[in-house]
Amino acid sequence: MTNSIEVINLSKSYKSKQAVNNITFKINKNEIVGLLGPNGCGKTTTIGMMLGLLKPTSGRVLINGMDIEKNKISLLHKMNFISPYIELPKKLTVRQNLIVYGKLYNVNNLNEQIDYLSNKLRLKELLDKVTGELSSGQKNRVSLAKALINDPTVLLLDEPTASLDPETGDFVRTFLENYKKEKKISVLLASHNMDEIKRLCGSVLMMKDGAIIDSGTPSHLITKHGRKNLEEVFLELVRSKNEFN
């Protein structure tokens, strides 16, 4: 199976702070891998380096075998990401938002892509509304459409369902499940949501203090640690003071 994403001995330091410490993992084509860890453990920094937005102190990120630092422009055209911390331009309509982002990525079949995503994400009736008037759930679906406008082969998700109501969160998770199967993309999902991780991810990376402290399928991790569920495994690992330090 092709390794669409390969992170090799990746580290990031800020003066005396080690934000990410020598992490290594792979994500195959048609696979969603979960990145689970407490606030401040290095998840967002890791995603920033994978996107080429942050320069690693050491290590490499390979996308389809190519180094992101050396091939940033060409690789970013086939990558995208979602974060709840990035706001949409409030005065643009949904359609205008998608057109702007589509042109940034030089999408050739832009109108067809907008039609496809607006149908899949239930945005058809919202295309001519300004985003400043949308609910948080509607904005989330627009952000998802924006992240998929360039038909990426690699998708990085940072808390994609944060602050969503249960119904909208379930819709987004179902969409991601189906989209991954249809497009055979590689996905890294950073989340605090255990149900989301268990439902979407074939394997999980447990992160603490900038390091990957354990990894495996949810069932493997539960069995290995003799716990009832993934949440208990997670709490055991992040509360450990000495075992992994």
Model region roles, listed by residue range:
Residues 130-134:
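Conserved ABC ATPase signature
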Residues 155-158:
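Catalytic Walker B motif of ABC-type/P-loop ATPase nucleotide-binding domains
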Residues 99, 103-126:
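Conserved ABC ATPase "signature" region
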Residues 151:
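Conserved catalytic motifs of ABC-family nucleotide-binding domains
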Residues 215-216:
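ABC ATPase "signature
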Residues 170-182:
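Helical segment within the ABC ATPase nucleotide-binding domain
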